[in-house]
């Protein structure tokens, strides 16, 4: 009888090309996603050494990090952005790599574009020079971010040195209450594990609340696996996964489809497989979440008071809480709803898919954005934008006073003109609330799309359950 394995171990073992004694194993990489920010030096390295891209058919590029969301002009986000986008175009042309550039109908945030085109498939290894590559783990693929030198290594060899990680199971038992979203689930998880609780692990998310999620919701959860310190996040594929993939541009077809599904159905953790760590949450206890601090683990339910540093027994956590409250301009004991928001951002690789647009539009319909708030809706791709417009969501947003923008990473990381001014407070559907992430001295609160839209209308945080 062979040893019982976790889903992670099954995918990892199936991709080991070379495992020399005493050496880090070399894994085969099935898909390599490329964007304009972390690829220029990698292509330069190939050029210097006279190497081609080994597998152009497994390499896909797009522009997302610093594209403007107001115009398709590559000059709009400044000199550095223009150079990076022009360099990507030149590199993809020279090396024969597929590029969905700023004017292409498939352009979008790399972690939105890959899944919606069927590039992302269960059981694959997927890498990208971007920390939120974990998103693709929602399909039961092993997906993780890599550095620029590793980008060059994958371009040249289609392989990567990768040691075996520890495994963690995060089970969300039972069903969530009405109005609770995937974003609330994952923020509650990070609140429990802390922002470093998953360090050194690949996490598998499971339980009824996870199985109940759509693919969009599962992508939101896996996207933020990195925010609890994990290397990657995985969810076992099931009928929801297969229904989402079927018929997409790069999905298998005909008899290949049947064979693929047969294989994908084996991609689950064996019953008696052992995890190195197990974390359990009760879904019914999860409320709408809002971060109050400067890492995603500093999070509370919207109906809880802002915590006092004295509540933290660990001196490091206490000091971190003190610093976070000072930076965020918050007072312990008050409610987050006591503070007005200046900007609202619905978008990013965490929450910019069609389901997220629909959730925000359902809240916005027939209402008006508060007069002091600037609210941006940034679809994750041209495909999402077209779908939203076909459903009339853009009109709902514009009528309510939201700005309907072009696709890109936008205000998640302020590499274009979408950013916070010093001291501005933002309700954001993105994944990182670090100091300065959305602009120097900006104050970021992470929330779900519905919570963000409600904050835009009320002018401050509200409990979506009472909105």
From Swiss-Prot:
Keywords: 4Fe-4S, Amino-acid biosynthesis, Branched-chain amino acid biosynthesis, Iron, Iron-sulfur, Leucine biosynthesis, Lyase, Metal-binding. It holds the Pfam family Aconitase. It is an enzyme of class 4 (lyase). Pathway: Amino-acid biosynthesis; L-leucine biosynthesis; L-leucine from 3-methyl-2-oxobutanoate: step 2/4. It comes from the Bacteria. Its EC number is 4.2.1.33. GO terms for molecular function: 3-isopropylmalate dehydratase activity; 4 iron, 4 sulfur cluster binding; metal ion binding. Heterodimer of LeuC and LeuD. GO terms for biological process: L-leucine biosynthetic process. Binds 1 [4Fe-4S] cluster per subunit. Belongs to the aconitase/IPM isomerase family. LeuC type 1 subfamily. [4Fe-4S] cluster binds at residues 349, 409, 412. Transmembrane segments: none annotated. InterPro entries: 3-IsopropMal_deHydase_lsu, Acnase/IPM_dHydase_lsu_aba_1/3, Acoase/IPM_deHydtase_lsu_aba, Aconitase_4Fe-4S_BS, Aconitase_4Fe-4S_dom, IPM_dehydratase_rel_enz, IPMI_cat. This is 3-isopropylmalate dehydratase large subunit. PROSITE patterns: ACONITASE_1 (PS00450), ACONITASE_2 (PS01244). Catalyzes the isomerization between 2-isopropylmalate and 3-isopropylmalate, via the formation of 2-isopropylmaleate. Gene3D superfamilies: Aconitase, domain 3. It catalyses: (2R,3S)-3-isopropylmalate = (2S)-2-isopropylmalate. Its cofactor is [4Fe-4S] cluster.
